[in-house]
Amino acid sequence: MGRAGMLKAIVGEFRHDRRGNYSLMTAITIVPLMAGLALSVDYGELLRQKHETLNALDAAGLAAAQQIVAGASDNDVKAYAKTFFETNLARIDPANTALTVTLPNNNAGGGTLKLCASLTFHPYFLPAASLLIGGTASDTTFTECSELRLKNTLEVALVLDNSGSMSDLGSGTGEKRINLLKSAAKQLVDTLALQAQQMKQITKPVQFSLVPFAASVNVGPTHDQDGWMDQDGMSPIQHEDFDWTTMSAANNPDKYAEKLNGVWYKRGTGWGETKDQPLTRFSLYADMTVESGREEVPNSKQYVCDTYKKNGTCQYGHWSAPEYIYTTSRYASWQGCVEARPYPYNVSDTTPDTTAPATLFVPMFAPDEAGTLWLDFNRDGINDVIGTSYNYGNNWWADWPYVAGPTASQRQSDMRKYFLVKPYGSQSAAAGDGPNSSCTTNPITPLKDVSQDAEKQEIKDAIDAMAPNGNTNVPEGLAWGWRTVSSNPPFTDGRPNSERGNDKVVVVLTDGANTYSAVSDGSYANNRSTYAAYGYTGLTYPGSGSVTRLFMNTSTDIGKTTYTGANYTAALDEQMKTLCANAKNSNILVMTVALDLSPTDASDKKAIDALKACSSDSRFRKDSADPSKPAKLFWNATGATLSDNFKEIANELSNLRIVG
């Protein structure tokens, strides 16, 4: 006899008992008492089974998501989810449940995984209690659902320090920091690539870009014709180092410069085929020439100029034998580095637009600083000018020799000098000097699909090719890391910025503080710094209130007329703080790594704090010191721990691809 039958029989006996009022009262009261007891017991059991079903449902959802990310077939995912669900039902009979799995229908960047479970609950006492009051026995069925949004795609920019100090040995190792970094970075790429290769149904599941940085960032010389570069000299920083008024029609009517609507143009027949085209840094690279070879003409003489006129033409000369035919070639080509845009565009992903010239990117062109590299202008073995040294480090050309007593500033900015032809056999510039000075890194490698072996190898080859040289400008590296994963120009390989199911991540590693080199030259050309991504700090930006670009939008803690290395570092730190906030507000996940920085060193401590503040919060880990807060995506690494730290980064990135 079942529980309900036993209960019914007991109640029946009381109902038929005629032995006094006690029996009658007992019969009257036992019915609601037993019904209440049945309801209490069954309700508690119902809540327990419902709770266990929900727990099993959540666990099955996470397990199914992992199978989808790993590339399992639809049928295998559903079977795995069912098995996982039933295994976690604890004391519930799987026969009383049913699981429905709805797979994502978007395999190119996310989607929603939905699991619904129905539970049929068989109460213990409620059916009998219902019969006692004239009701009918029944089971209870309820359904619960759980949804997980899959993040199937990932775009990662590796922003890696290539400054000179990366050639130092990593602490606790006998290896150079740059070599330790190469190994760790390639290991990270391999780990994520292996996971990506298992995702058969998803296009470009994991992509990596590489941004080597030092004093500047190299976007690549192949972009010299792109529309996001300033092709017409419209940017307000395009000509800040140049004085085109020195090329006036009065000085040379055949070859002069004219400004029209903010753009300088080539005027006069002396420009040849490029007449009436804009004067830009690109045009300067194209127009500077050097005599790179010569061939003797038999039985010949040549005319050698002894005295020049003010316009550069010969006044007196003599004949000398033999005569040579000289071959000229371009002196230098743009290597690919760009200057930082003026605020606010230096700390943003704003799309370059010719209607807003300050948004355009300008190629770096390090001016020839005061001092004449060669003194013999006519190859006769006799110096035509007297050398003047200003102790500048980037003296790679001759100053215009036909002005009496020029100042250092005039020597540096007089544009006529760049159209002199460098004589055959004249002194060469020192290594690293020239218009590409401070451009020391290899070009950016844009996003590559590392699920494809060939593209994965491109990233790894670019990592291997890194070489340390130059200062440290973390914000420029970070800004370009952001731009490589963005869908906005210049680099448009990233998925749409608004696409759900895709994470954009920038991993930044540096081994030191931000640096911008100061120089003591107040009595010379007033450069105040070496030339780098922010140009010379001695120059002010138009409309900024006489502030140099590096100091724009900085706090009162930054002395606006303090031209020291420490003040430059503080200014770069503030630029980085603003940039980090902007990137994170644009849903960029920022991970930062400090390499061999000591918390007990004041300078290192500032760099550590800045990097930690820049980093995003982890979505999965808690702060070990305060479990109520998320952990920061920051690693204070040493040379000895770098490999393990990058494994932790790989784990964090792997988790991003499962659920959000």
Model-derived regions: residue spans:
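Short amphipathic secondary-structure patches
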Residues: 2, 47, 51, 61-123, ...
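MIDAS-like acidic motif and immediate structural context at the N-terminus
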Residues: 35-38, 42, 149-177, 181, ...
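Acidic, polar low-complexity linker/tail segments
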Residues: 8-29, 108-157, 166-170, 482, ...
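Structural recognition of the beta-strand scaffold that forms the well-ordered cores
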Residues: 24-25, 55, 155-160, 208-212, ...
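Solvent-exposed loop/turn segments at secondary-structure junctions
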Residues: 121-123, 162-167, 214-218, 469-470, ...
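Alpha-helical assembly-interface signal, strongest on the long, hydrophobic N-terminal helix that forms
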Residues: 2-79, 615
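Acidic, Ser/Thr/Gly/Pro-rich low-complexity segments that form flexible
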Residues: 222-602, 619, 623
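…and closely analogous acidic/polar surface helices at protein-protein or active-site interfaces
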Residues: 49, 166-207, 381, 389, ...
